From Swiss-Prot:
It holds the Pfam family TGT. Belongs to the queuine tRNA-ribosyltransferase family. Binds 1 zinc ion per subunit. The keyword Translocase does not apply. One of its GO terms (molecular function) is metal ion binding. PANTHER family: QUEUINE TRNA-RIBOSYLTRANSFERASE. This is Queuine tRNA-ribosyltransferase. GO terms for cellular component: cytosol. Homodimer. Within each dimer, one monomer is responsible for RNA recognition and catalysis, while the other monomer binds to the replacement base PreQ1. InterPro entries: ArchSynthase1/Queuine_TRR, TGT, TGT-like_sf, tRNA_ribo_trans-like. The active site is at 90 (proton acceptor), 270 (nucleophile). Keywords: Glycosyltransferase, Metal-binding, Queuosine biosynthesis, Transferase, tRNA processing, Zinc. Coiled coil: none annotated.
Length: 376
C-alpha cells in the first residue's frame, strides 16, 4: 500500500506525505542506511529519538547474510531488526554490478560469485522481487542496471548508456509483473536511468510511466561523475517525474545535495555519508564541517553546534569527542553518528517547514551562507 499526498509546493520544492503499511512518512525525508538490517552504531530506539521515519535495507547483503530463511522465521525484516516503522529495500542491482569482473550480465539477469564464500549465484528481476517480498519491505525497488559513469576508464558513450537503460526498462516490466504475481501488498518504485544523457533519461521515464509504479527514483547519479553533470541531470529529471507520485534520489549525498534535490522536486533521499563520515570523525553542522580529529579541538569546551538539539551536542564538548576519536572508543562513533543523522533529519524538518511557509528559496540562501561561513 502507498498513498501519496502532495500537501503544498514552493517552486519545484514539494511538501508531501507518504502513507505505507508500517506508517506515515513526512516528506522531504532522509532515510538512514541500514545495509545489514542495522544502521551502524545506532539502535532502533535511538533512531526513533532522533526522528527517523523510514530506513533503508540492502536486499543483496540480507539475502547473503543472514539469509531469507532466518528473516522468514520472523515474518519479515521489521520484527527481525526490531523496527516497526517503514523500510525501503534496494533491489540488489547496484551491489551486483559493483562486483566488476566477478559478475556476468545477460538479458535474464546477473550471475556472480558470492563475496561471502565464492558460491555461484544468480539474481534476476523475478528473484529480486521474491527476496523483497520475503523481507516485506514497505517500498520495493525494481531490479535495474546502474549505468556506470565510466567504462574502461572513460565516460560511458550514448550507445552504452542507451543499451543499459533499455535493459533496465525491460527488467522494470519483469519486476512489475513479478511484483503483481506475488500479490505484494507493499509499494514498488521504478528507477530512471540513462547516464548523463537527457534524451535517454526522458526515454527511461516515459517507459517507466507506462508501467504505473507507485513511485519513481532517479538512479545512476553520484557514481563518479562531476558534480556539474549530476546537477544538470537532476535539474532535468526531477521536475519531470510524475507529480502525483513520490520522487526518490538514490544514494545522494551531502547536505548541499539534499537541498538542491528538494529544489528540483525530490521527496526522498538516502546515503551512507552521515554514518560513514561520523565513524571517520567528519561531522556536519549548519556552519560547515568539523574534522574532530584535528588538534584544534583538543581543549575546545564548546559543543559541535550550539544550535543543535541532539543528545551529543546537549551533553558533550568537542574536546571529549576529539578524545574519544583519538583513542578509538566505540562511544565516539556512536555520539558522532547520533549527531550527523540528527543534523540530516533536522535539515529535512527545516525544509518541510520552509516549503509549508513558502520561503524555501530564502531558506536555501541562508543555508548556503551558513555552511560557507564555516565553524569558528
Amino acid at each position: 500500500m502507498l498513498n501519496f499526498e502532495l500537501l503544498t509546493t514552493d517552486g519545484n520544492a514539494r511538501r508531501g506525505r507518504v502513507t505505507l503499511n508500517h506508517g506515515v512518512v513526512e516528506t522531504p525525508i532522509f532515510m538512514p542506511v541500514g545495509t545489514y538490517g542495522s544502521v551502524k552504531a545506532m539502535s532502533p530506539l535511538e533512531l526513533n529519538e532522533i526522528g527517523a521515519q523510514i530506513i533503508l535495507g540492502n536486499t543483496f547483503h540480507l539475502w547473503l547474510r543472514p539469509g531469507l530463511d532466518v528473516v522468514d522465521t520472523h515474518a519479515g525484516l521489521h520484527k527481525f531488526i526490531g523496527w516497526d516503522k517503514p523500510i525501503l529495500t534496494d533491489s540488489g542491482g547496484f551491489q551486483v554490478f559493483s562486483l566488476g569482473e566477478l559478475r556476468k550480465i545477460t538479458e535474464e539477469g546477473v550471475t556472480f560469485a558470492s563475496p561471502v564464500n565464492g558460491d555461484k549465484l544468480f539474481l534476476s528481476p523475478e528473484i529480486s522481487m521474491q527476496i523483497q517480498r520475503t523481507l516485506n519491505s514497505d517500498i520495493v525497488m525494481q531490479f535495474d542496471e546502474c549505468t556506470p559513469y565510466e567504462i574502461d576508464g572513460r565516460p560511458a558513450t550514448h550507445d552504452e548508456a542507451a543499451r543499459s537503460m533499455r535493459m533496465s526498462l525491460r527488467w522494470a516490466k519483469r519486476s512489475r509483473d513479478e511484483f503483481d504475481h506475488l500479490a505484494n501488498p507493499n509499494a514498488l518504485f521504478g528507477i530512471v536511468q540513462g547516464g548523463m544523457f537527457e534524451d535517454l533519461r526522458d526515454e527511461s521515464l516515459a517507459g517507466l510511466s507506462e508501467l504505473d509504479f507507485h513511485g519513481y527514483a532517479i538512479g545512476g547519479l553520484s557514481v563518479g561523475e562531476p558534480k556539474e553533470d549530476m546537477m544538470r541531470v537532476l535539474e532535468h529529471v526531477g521536475p519531470r517525474l510524475p507529480a502525483h507520485k513520490p520522487h526518490y534520489l538514490m544514494g545522494v549525498g551531502t547536505p548541499e545535495d539534499l537541498v538542491a534535490g528538494v529544489a528540483h522536486g525530490v521527496d526522498m533521499f538516502d546515503c551512507v555519508m552521515p554514518t560513514r563520515n561520523a565513524r571517520n570523525g567528519w561531522l556536519f553542522t549548519r556552519f560547515g564541517d568539523v574534522k574532530i580529529r584535528n588538534a584544534a579541538h583538543r581543549n575546545d569546551p564548546r559543543p559541535l553546534d550550539e544550535q543543535c538539539g541532539c543528545y551529543t551536542c546537549r551533553n558533550f564538548s568537542r574536546a571529549y569527542l576529539h578524545h574519544l576519536h583519538r583513542v578509538g572508543e566505540i562511544l565516539g562513533a556512536r555520539l558522532n553518528t547520533i549527531h550527523n543523522l540528527y543534523y540530516y533529519l533536522e535539515l529535512m524538518r527545516e525544509m518541510r517547514t520552509a516549503i509549508e511557509e513558502h520561503r524555501f528559496e530564502a531558506f536555501r540562501r541562508q543555508f548556503a551562507e551558513n555552511r560557507a561561513r564555516g565553524t569558528r
